[in-house]
């Protein structure tokens, strides 16, 4: 099935002073091929880093502008110092401060023809003065913004920035109504309201605790000649035995007259160069080019080496005049094609059809295995080392996709995941409910365009999603209209990727075994693409992070995101546990069993209808009790090991619907083998052994859920006391064994046999399975059952 025609990205208005603002006025400029790729004798481009110690002063009464704190002659001797980049949370007096904070920095004039002042990331409002003159403002947290300062510089300069991370008054209500009634004012996604961040999402006064404000990314002076690059878009198109790359170059001429320059391009990996003569008109110019690459190496996710690897190309672009390089830019890109199966319904809300939500990369069907992701809300703390470490965790658990959940990470994440071959489902920065007036809608549309432009060239980004859990309910129809407009805009801008209107619609968020019901109820479901499922678990380190952690105090634990009453519903009252460690271990065992069961069920239903699954989520990014399988110190918990096993490329498993059986009952367990490799494994054997062992039974308590935390939206309340059979002692006597032969085809999921047993007396059992080819064990698994 052919997808839509792929074209270069369409342009749409962005936020004032965005780095993409010049593109809107770009003039189409003709180019002429030129001979040779000349070396240059002098480079006029570069940058001056303004990071380091800045002066700052909080402005609780908002008097700074009236009192002229932007005046370069103002003495700032009594102002304190702060490292930039940083977040307000790094300074105790600013951790819960929502008024303006003023920053000042002195610097010398650099030697350059053209100078731009670049802010790579400020959260959330910024107003900028240079030498007492106001340059402008910016709103948002993820998109860089800039000002031309060439003619405003002195020998000694004073830069002043007023930054405010506002308190969102749209977060209101009480208890669960906080989520339903909130009409937030600022599109910050999970960064200011979420059930996995500091505070208490059921308490609007605490929900925004330890905010994310600050100058959290570097500030730089960009130096160049009078003609410089604004941006480059790269759009790869796969063809038979070749690829065509659409190259859209935006460059600005800051002079008053047209000027002829050379545009030099080089793709390093294929050792090819091109040179063009360009007549750059005053203002921004758009140059459209194409480059044919024969027998291209394609970008594939890391876990399919039989298909390819995440190959990247490097495009070096230079603007040259009279042997001088006025500016240069390096863009890395991958050649890959992504298609999401199924057809959109008439409203564009979901995909339908037999291939709905099945993923195709470069024409090859790929079963998605992954999780939701947030590195930290305090983005000044990220680094290449942190992202590479998280990539190792993701790949170590056999995952090939993350959903960057209702926020945007700094560009470094996307660079690392391009290199590592990890696919990204990228949410726009909307979470739950918002105001939906025309002004807010237009703001969101401009920011959505910025998101797409900023990360357009990254092959790891395979989908844009406009909103997470928008809560389209009868008294909040505005959100539906907002999402319709965002979906239409994203579809018009980027024709190279699938667009999803709202997560939770079409894809599935399933919390059976947490927000009601039992996790084994998922066996009855047929979901094309679950993108959230999981339960909370307590890290053993949690006791070190908060005072008086045991016995648990509801208010303190809730501040750290713990849904204690739900934990007790599925684990039993904390009072029956002898220690914090015992309670924490029970939570991890329960989470591990739940995640393992979910993933195995989704893989049994592979392509019938399930195209993949994403757990919620990888890590608890701050000291908290959350849905992560890794704690904030990056220590894996039991749930991580469960996902690692359940996501293995080859899986042997049983399709069970109960783990506790009656005495004398004939138990029959269907055995399934799943192969995600696109290679035939041929003849293999499934071997199984049954042991007498000593298991652990975790028994819940129905009263906790209803008494402690009323949740009216639960559509499947807990009618039965949850009982979860978990590993206990690993020893035990072997009772029986067996084996059968199987043919394991490529990219398949098949029922291959059955294991049966019957016991007349109570017994604890451990079932061990292995998939064997010759002397090699390709996969193994184990289960725990009780006969009572």
What are these regions (language model features)?
Residues 401-632:
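Substrate-binding/catalytic cleft of secreted carbohydrate-active enzymes
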Residues 1-404, 447, 463, 483, ...:
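Secreted/periplasmic carbohydrate-active enzymes, especially glycoside hydrolases
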